[in-house]
Design a protein with these regions (language model features):
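Transmembrane and membrane-interface helices of multi-pass
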Residues: 2-194
Length: 194
């Protein structure tokens, strides 16, 4: 398997890009949770929450990834074929995988500064404060300049890395037979949205 990992010619399953990026993002979520929990270990230990933290965290990560990648998985099953529509969808899928993964990295990078300021993980306040960009920007520049610079640089690196990985992941995916598409589409719907 390893000799085929970054080669161009090996055909891949239709949903390989979705599974591959889901695995990558599960690793990102887990490493972030590990880092945050070690940083806040007194709080976690005070409630004997280590097992619960990682089990419930994994559950929420899977749910989040199903919502993020469920629609592209369904559309890949329904739209991808080796024709013009398939090539267009391949480009859209590459963008979706990259943008979704970069969003996850950005949110995980923003979490420590948000916790320091508001004592919570990013939530609806994170979005609500974005309607006041001048105030948010001045607060970030005054109190979290190093975090902003680090997050910006790391997010830009993530864009490049994820774009290349997504290009590799969507290359050589093989279309599914039309007779199997409705069955797999129903499975994707059941696993992603129910």
């Amino acid at each position: 398997m390893s000799r085929y990992l970054f080669t161009k010619g090996r055909p891949r399953s239709l949903l390989f890009p979705i599974f591959f990026f889901s695995l990558i993002n599960l690793i990102v979520f887990t490493l972030s949770r590990l880092g945050l929990s070690l940083w806040q270990q007194e709080r976690v230990s005070a409630v004997n929450g280590w097992g619960e933290l990682f089990l419930q965290g994994l559950r929420m990560d899977v749910v989040s990834l199903c919502y993020l990648f469920g629609v592209p998985a369904l559309l890949t099953v329904l739209l991808y074929h080796q024709n013009a529509l398939g090539r267009i969808w391949q480009r859209i899928l590459r963008f979706w995988l990259t943008a979704g993964s970069v969003f996850i990295v950005f949110m995980e990078l923003a979490t420590p500064a948000f916790i320091e300021t508001y004592d919570y993980r990013p939530n609806r306040l994170f979005i609500e404060y974005l309607i006041y960009p001048k105030e948010v920007f001045s607060m970030l520049m005054e109190g979290h300049l190093s975090a902003v610079i680090f997050s910006l640089v790391f997010t830009l690196i993530a864009v490049v890395v994820y774009w290349k990985l997504a290009g590799w992941a969507v290359r050589n995916i093989t279309p599914m037979r039309w007779t199997w598409r409705p069955v797999v589409a129903l499975l994707v719907i059941a696993l992603s949205f129910l």
